[in-house]
Amino acid sequence: MTTAQILETARHTPVWHVWVCAAGVSTAAGQGASGPHGDRDDRRAALLSRLEATLGGRREPVRSTGVGGTPVLEAPGLGIVQRCPTCGRDGHGAPRLTAPGVRAQTLPPISFAHVGGSRPGTVLAWLDVHAEDWAVGVDVEDVRARRVRRAFTPGPDGAADIDAVAFSAAERAGLERGAAAGQDPVTARARLWCAKEALVKAAGTGFLADPSAVDVAASDVRLVPLGPDVLPDGWVGALALRPLTPPGRS
């Protein structure tokens, strides 16, 4: 798996990018982002600045031919708006890009994830497609973080404190089988949790009920596990790609 992974679909092939801004992370040009590491707003701003520079050098493809037409960004000023699809209020919900003189639907879908604790960082995921075509969600966890280990470490009965609320009976059974096969139980739970978070981020809703009700096998969503080739050592994550256009529409 690479930082820009082509995912084959029946309609088109969205290419995803995951950029990380965190202390001690060194990524190749075009495959990551560097910048301030202490404050999540600063990290997010650094990632947006990198994305603005990337989009500023691209040209919007003409859909009928696929040949580049007008620039994706004709002027600087890339920003973010959030509106909750459930309550209709601003300030939360899935982030969407804005830019001067550009229809939001022509900009790429994005998603952010933040890691706190002693190794803080921010992750930006974005797609090489229009926002009207796909939604993306990303989530990451640091399995070395005390908070994560406290939540996901099984007790003497084999269950972690969060299991009953976070995972369905079938998922808990799968975790037990994985532990019996030698999988690290904290990492396995963190990966599954990230998949659920990524799904609800791609939906733009957050958790509307217990996380155990979120089915990671949803048929219209593609889940991509994120590992050490993309993330800092000790982090795990997941990317969710949700198509927004009906089959047959280009």
Where are these regions (language model features)?
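Core catalytic alpha/beta fold that binds nucleotide/phospho-ligands
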Residues: 1-250
